[in-house]
Amino acid sequence: MLMLENSLANTSQATDTWINHHDSSSAAFSKKKKHDWQGKPYHPISRHYRECFGTKVFKVSVSVAETCPNREGLNGSKICSFCDEWGSAAYHLERDKPLSEQIKINREAIRKRYRAERFLVYFQAYTNTLGKVQKLQDWFDAALMEKDVVGIVLGTRPDCLPSRVLKLFQEYSERSYLSVELGIQTLDDEQLNFLSRGHDSQCSLDAIDKLKEIPGLNVCTHLIFGIPGETDEQLIETARVLSEKKIDGVKLHNLHVLQGTPLEQIFVKGDFAPLSLEEYTRKVALFLEYLDPSVAVHRLAAVASRWNELLAPEWNREKMRPMQFIEDYMRNNQMFQGRLS
C-alpha cells in the first residue's frame, strides 16, 4: 500500500548559465501548450541540458564510492535483490584508477564518439554520500577543476542524506550545476521489501522534500517498473505524487535479472518473471501521461552493461530498440507526457 498521505498534504561560466536559467525556465516551460521536445512524446533530458547550458552536455561516469549501507549490513539490511557486485556501475568505468584519470579517460572517449564539448561528472556507482563529507567535497572539487566540466551529478539513497551532506549540496548548488539522482525505486513498501532496499516509502518522500528545499539543486528520482504486485493505479499515483513534489527528472528502469544477484535465485525458482518489452512499454507510457511535462526523462529503460551477466529479459541487451519501441507506441496512440496530468 502506498505511503502517500503525508506527501500529498571548474567553471564560472557554467555557474552563471545555470543560475540565470534556474530562476525562470521551470515555470515558463510548464505553461507551454506545445512542447519543444525534439520530436519526442516526452521531455528528454537532452532538452533540459540545452536549456541550462545552451549546448549539448554529456555525462562522464566515474566510480569512487566503494560500498553502500546494505553491503555494510547497516540496520540489518541485505544487498538489494537486483544489484550486482559492481553497484550499478557502467561497464566502461576505470574504477581502479584515480578520479582524475577516470574523468580524463571516459571524457575523451565520449568526446571522440559524440564530438562533445561540455560534460557533467557523474558519480554513479554505490552510495556516494556514505562516508566522510570531506571526501565527497574533495571529489566535487577535483571534478569541477577538470577541463570542460560544467557540473556534477551524484547518485545516492534516500536514507543516506545526513544534514552535513545536505549542507554541502547547498554550498555547491550555489556555484555550479548539481543534480542528485535519488534511488527511490518504488513508493510501495511491500515492493521495497521485495527489493531488500532497507528503507520505506516515507523515507523516500522525506528525502525528496529535504533535497527540494535546497535552491538550485536538481533532483532526479530513479524508478523500477515490473516489481511483483505493481498495478496501473500505483504507477499513476506515483506520477502524480512526484509531480506534486516538483521533482526535476526521472530515470526509468525495468526490473531485470543479473547473474550473482539475489534476484537470480528468485528467478530460477520461478517466483519472478520480468516484463515483456510490450508490457513494459505500456506501463511507461501510462506513467508518463500522468507525469508533469516539466519533468525531464533521463532514461526510458534499463540496459545491461555486462551482457554476459544478463539472464532476463533478452531485450535488455539493447539500448536503442526499446527506446524507439516506446516512442513509436506513444506516437501511434497519440500519447505524450503530461497529457493526463
Predicted feature locations:
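N-terminal [4Fe-4S]-dependent radical SAM core
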Residues: L2-L120
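Conserved C-terminal portion of the radical SAM core fold
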Residues: Q202-P262, E278-A301
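Core AdoMet radical
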Residues: W86-N106, I110-V133, D148-L161, Y177-S204, ...
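Acidic (Asp/Glu)-rich catalytic clusters
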Residues: I110-K112, F140-K147, F169-Y177, D209-I214
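Distinct, well-ordered alpha-helical segments
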Residues: V133-D141, P162-E171
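Structural recognition of alpha->loop->beta junctions
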Residues: C80, A142-V149, E237-K251, R321-F336, ...
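Auxiliary Fe-S-binding modules of radical SAM enzymes
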Residues: L2-R47, K56-F58, G249, H256-S341
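Hydrophobic faces of well-ordered beta-strands that scaffold small-molecule active sites
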Residues: F58-V62, F119-V121, I152-L154, L178-L182, ...
